[in-house]
């Protein structure tokens, strides 16, 4: 049995398991955070490497993930129902600011979320148009699409989905909902309904990608404030991590990876200082907050063959200075 089989759940194949956890350079007595518990693959592997004195704090905003986590009966383990952007606040409450030895983030949608049609993330299965990571709060995709303007929707599709036909798709969606309201019919409220409307709006089809892929990604990212959450946790991690503490982050699309890459690069250079200041080399180096650990890591051919959803994964690791 492979490591992925051991620490993955029947419904979720943990991506880059060995590499992401290995990137934390685990200390057996260390304190770690799994900011995206999901179905617990990374968390279970981390726990298997810790001593009785080690600690793991897991976080997830998905109520279904919280239910899974509550089945882990381990005194070293704590689960928190929140967004990973709350990591600084959580650490402050626990008295752990500056004491965390590593933070792992596995960004994006989990397989159980995609495979459960009732969550509304998939354009391949019919279900209610929801798309919320945390179904207990915020607007669903259905509710948001009923009130958004054509201009704002086009901006979301272009910005978060890099969709070249954003204006066409936005016009079709807003037009459909307006017509539905005027005729007394139901506005868009099903995933396949939206996917079909998008497909009809796109003049050119990519034979390798469903025409609704980028739009569903964009709406999901906006509904869940995913990039805002990522920016907050990146900035907050600097105060949370102990010296030599590690960041291990798996991203699944270029927008996320670009943010992580640029953040690590910026923090490894330090703050911009005016040219010409009489600074010694050690003063300049002291200004640096992170150093990258190795290069970006992608799944092996073997992993991609076993789990097609891993093909876009990129892992980046950095260490607190």
Swiss-Prot record:
Localization, UniProt: Cytoplasm
Q: What is its main location?
A: cytoplasm
The chain's coiled-coil residues are none
Chain positions recorded as S-adenosyl-L-methionine binding sites: 40-42, 60, 84, 106, 113
* Top-level taxon of origin: Bacteria
One GO MF term, please? rRNA (cytosine-N4-)-methyltransferase activity
Reactions the enzyme catalyzes: cytidine(1402) in 16S rRNA + S-adenosyl-L-methionine = N(4)-methylcytidine(1402) in 16S rRNA + S-adenosyl-L-homocysteine + H(+)
- GO terms, biological process: rRNA base methylation
One GO location term (cellular component):
cytoplasm
The Swiss-Prot or TrEMBL record describes its family as follows: Belongs to the methyltransferase superfamily. RsmH family.
> Could you tell me what this protein does?
Specifically methylates the N4 position of cytidine in position 1402 (C1402) of 16S rRNA.
This one is known as Ribosomal RNA small subunit methyltransferase H
Tell me which species this is from: Histophilus somni (strain 2336)
């Amino acid at each position: 049995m492979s490591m992925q089989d051991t620490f993955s759940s029947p419904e979720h194949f943990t991506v880059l398991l060995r590499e992401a956890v290995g990137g934390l350079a685990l200390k057996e007595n260390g304190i770690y955070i799994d900011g995206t518990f999901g179905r617990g693959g990374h968390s279970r592997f981390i726990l298997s490497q810790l001593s009785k004195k080690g600690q793991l704090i897991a976080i997830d905003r998905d109520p279904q993930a919280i239910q899974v986590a509550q089945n882990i009966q381990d005194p070293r383990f704590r689960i928190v129902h929140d967004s990973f952007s709350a990591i600084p606040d959580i650490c402050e409450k626990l008295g752990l600011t500056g004491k965390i030895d590593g933070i792992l983030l596995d960004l994006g949608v989990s397989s159980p979320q995609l495979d459960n049609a009732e969550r509304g993330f998939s354009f391949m299965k019919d279900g209610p148009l929801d798309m919320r990571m945390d179904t207990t709060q915020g607007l669903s995709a259905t509710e948001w699409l009923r009130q958004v303007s054509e201009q704002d929707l086009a901006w979301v599709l272009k910005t978060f989905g890099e969709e070249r036909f954003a204006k066409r798709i936005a016009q079709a969606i807003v037009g459909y909902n307006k017509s539905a309201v005027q005729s007394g019919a139901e506005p868009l409220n099903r995933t396949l309904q939206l996917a079909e409307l998008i497909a009809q709006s796109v003049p050119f089809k990519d034979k390798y990608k469903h025409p609704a892929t980028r739009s569903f990604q964009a709406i999901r990212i906006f509904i869940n404030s995913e990039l805002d959450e990522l920016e907050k946790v990146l900035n907050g991690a600097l105060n949370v991590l102990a010296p030599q503490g590690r960041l291990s982050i798996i991203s699944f699309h270029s927008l996320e990876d670009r943010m992580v890459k640029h953040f690590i690069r910026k923090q490894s250079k330090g703050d911009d200082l005016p040219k010409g200041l009489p600074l010694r080399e050690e003063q300049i180096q002291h200004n640096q907050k992170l150093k990258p650990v190795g290069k970006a890591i992608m799944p092996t051919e073997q992993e991609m063959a076993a789990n097609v959803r891993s093909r876009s994964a990129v892992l980046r690791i950095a260490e607190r200075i």
